[in-house]
Amino acid sequence: TGSMVRIKIKRENVKRGSGEKNQFLFPIGNINQLTIYPMNFGEFLFNKNKLLYDLIIDSFNSKMALEDSAHRKALDIFYDYLLVGGMPEAVDVYLKTGSFQKSREILVDLYDNYLADMQLYQASPESIARAKKIFENIYTQLNKESKNFKTTLIGKKLKGRDVRSPIDWLSLAFLLYKSSLVKEQVTVPLTDSDESIFRLYLSDIGMFSYQSGINATTFI
């Protein structure tokens, strides 16, 4: 939640020696933290068609191929998931009404609320503007030939250091995921990565679908 993001930011500032006059005391023992993510496809399928979900699990465990009809049905539901995404309210509306349009309206509200909420936690107007631009720019970044994040698409004169803090905040709030380039073949968990070359992904595929400009009703 937003309040938890604020607490985490305060803790990070204290760790980094931000020079805040008032000492920040984390309420140990009074807060239970639970990270909630958008629903993945398995969870979406479980709620959409539990019989098919169970069939897929059984087929996987027994190492048997799905029948073509079941496979086609699963693909159809997967395409639905790509449009609806995994935000619980959007999924709930879609499952109850079968309407991509009504589900998309929920997504638009959530998307706009995310943007509006960013101004509560940024240190400066510049940081607010950059965080919003980064969030709104994810599809554009991934739709170009090189999928790697390009700072100049956020601002022509900006450097990597200028967007580091907004990206850190967006990651901390679980609004996006950052994937850095691994320098060499992964053999151990501690393999170094190149932090200057990375890609950003929205945490919810439905919001990514909305950001792409795809009209959900086109696929009905």
Regions found by a protein language model. Give the residues of each.
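Interdomain motor-coupling "hinge/lid" segment immediately C-terminal to the ATP-binding subdomain
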Residues: 2-3, 8-143
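Accessory nucleic acid-recognition modules appended to NTPase machines
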Residues: 92-220
